[in-house]
Curated annotation (Swiss-Prot):
The keyword Disulfide bond does not apply. Substrate binds at H164, E173, E302, D329, S381, H382, R383, S384, K405. InterPro entries: Enolase, Enolase-like_C_sf, Enolase-like_N, Enolase_C, Enolase_CS, Enolase_N. One of its GO terms (cellular component) is phosphopyruvate hydratase complex. Keywords: Cytoplasm, Glycolysis, Lyase, Magnesium, Metal-binding. SUPFAM superfamilies: Enolase C-terminal domain-like, Enolase N-terminal domain-like. This is Enolase 1. Its EC number is 4.2.1.11. One of its GO terms (biological process) is glycolytic process. It comes from Zea mays. Its cofactor is Mg(2+).
Amino acid sequence: MAVTITWVKARQIFDSRGNPTVEVDVGLSDGSYARGAVPSGASTGIYEALELRDGGSDYLGKGVLKAVSNVNNIIGPAIVGKDPTEQVEIDNFMVQQLDGTSNEWGWCKQKLGANAILAVSLAVCKAGAMVKKIPLYQHIANLAGNKTLVLPVPAFNVINGGSHAGNKLAMQEFMILPTGASSFKEAMKMGVEVYHNLKSIIKKKYGQDATNVGDEGGFAPNIQENKEGLELLKAAIEKAGYTGKVVIGMDVAASEFFGEKDKTYDLNFKEENNDGSNKISGDSLKDLYKSFVSEYPIESIEDPFDQDDWSTYAKLTDEIGQKVQIVGDDLLVTNPTRVAKAINEKTCNALLLKVNQIGSVTESIEAVRMSKRAGWGVMASHRSGETEDTFIADLSVGLSTGQIKTGAPCRSERLAKYNQLLRIEEELGDAAVYAGAKFRAPVEPY
């Protein structure tokens, strides 16, 4: 007798920012059950699939009871009796038939909500692994047709700016990547040591309150110059003794400070009495990145331009794309249609993989396979509003993304993912391979 889904239960829980989010349990005919919880972002791309919120006054409009109801009353009853190992079939059924809404970029989940569909998709994926009696990462690898498992390089977001922090810093994330480590375990050691060295440098320079942490566990010192963030990282890496072994990554989240009207980028956008004197063109911003890259060991720049500024993206990718990966997040929103366009137009050369931007495991896998076949890098990612769910840790190994960013080594909802990766590496034993310097292309495309 094949094991089937016998019940589905959704509930409203809370993310790491105290905002409601969706959690789903999927029960099986053998008496077991699996659980999935979805995250949510602060700086969201306008092309992301719909995250259904209730509106009204409860929870300041951020309740998810409609999404919960959609799972309990529409999706749940419709998937009872199905085989949880049939991920593609269940995802496509939810996305294309039960929801069925689409726009020019594909299935947009406007009816049921990407948060409702994804919570079920995650729980079904975990249930499928349980039924097959294999680890979740192996089940994901099998679904994708990936034969080689690789542990990702962690990209620790240790200095926060942009929409994640109350300082004046325009650029959102300054990250460290221990590419010179020989294992994930060693990468954690390097990351943690740089983080603690950074903390003492910031405390000494800016005072105790500058070491308060942001949504993702990074520090948010009150600095204005983006270059100062890079200087701090360089100093911390040096102090920890890892120069040459730990490189730098940035997530600029430039859509947050792009002016639609005059098509300029305002690096002073968080200043109260902003007179607009710091507005620059896309080309000037591109040159600023090139100067950063020549001065600092930067190997990854995410969302360097606005989500609709395809042409400036392509220029930067053409000019420095060999040396540095140019990652599309708001640009691509993990959407296979947008990924195809970017591959075609050589807009960027890496995908930021956020399952909740597209809303199903199957579509996420499709976006990753397309990216890898185009020779792109892939970085699996958390959201700023996270839960204790560790799905993306298994996802990054199962798809051999080569990279994962899930915050600083601080705050339990961030460490939950890193700790799961430590367990996976331990479980793989001698078969464990760490991406290291090959983080942009850790495996042959599958």
